[in-house]
């Protein structure tokens, strides 16, 4: 993304130089406008909540931290991104959230996190767009939690991005059968159900309520409590 955007800025600057004289302030404003179209990958703390935002650099995606546990994200023709707010480290906490989630194509709204030793990427999916993310994995069972049934899946990612760099690791999924964009997620119910199926988490790293987009467009505005 950085190299693409930098190239785009340089091209626009060159075109401007050939077309009409441009002052340094005008050129700087033009470059800033172009660069603001996408948010670079970053992690940190915002208003008492941990946030994580990652993008592969494809398309345009703007992630913005708001007050408290809120954030917004807008994306257009992206490759892949995932971002949101929550906690670091994660735990078997009860999570409350609300807002709007409007994907056009493939996107997920989920409690999302990582553990280490073993390295596990996990999702508790509350809503999704045109593609059920569990359909590419192995169905392991179901769990009833917070008023609905979730299907449980596992999958393996090979040589994929992770919190430890490029790695091969397991994914654990709980996918809610009835989609929603607000409510309570009792993570202990999912973690216990996974453990009963031999799906063991490691030591918790971060845990967020995330929006993810894959080769799609859309918008979301989410608040974590």
UniProtKB/Swiss-Prot annotation:
Task: Tell me, using the record's free text, what induces this protein.
Answer: Expressed in the presence of D-xylose under conditions of alkaline ambient pH, probably under the regulation of the pacC transcription factor. Repressed in presence of glucose through the action of the creA transcription repressor.
Give the top-rank taxon of the lineage listed in the UniProt record for this protein.
Answer: Eukaryota
Q: Where are the transmembrane segments?
A: none
Q: What class of enzyme is it?
A: hydrolase
Report the sequence similarity comment from the record.
Belongs to the glycosyl hydrolase 11 (cellulase G) family.
> What does the UniProt function comment say about this protein?
Endo-1,4-beta-xylanase involved in the hydrolysis of xylan, a major structural heterogeneous polysaccharide found in plant biomass representing the second most abundant polysaccharide in the biosphere, after cellulose.
Q: Could you identify this protein by its name?
A: Endo-1,4-beta-xylanase A
What phylogenetic lineage does the species belong to? Eukaryota, Fungi, Dikarya, Ascomycota, Pezizomycotina
- The encoding gene is xlnA
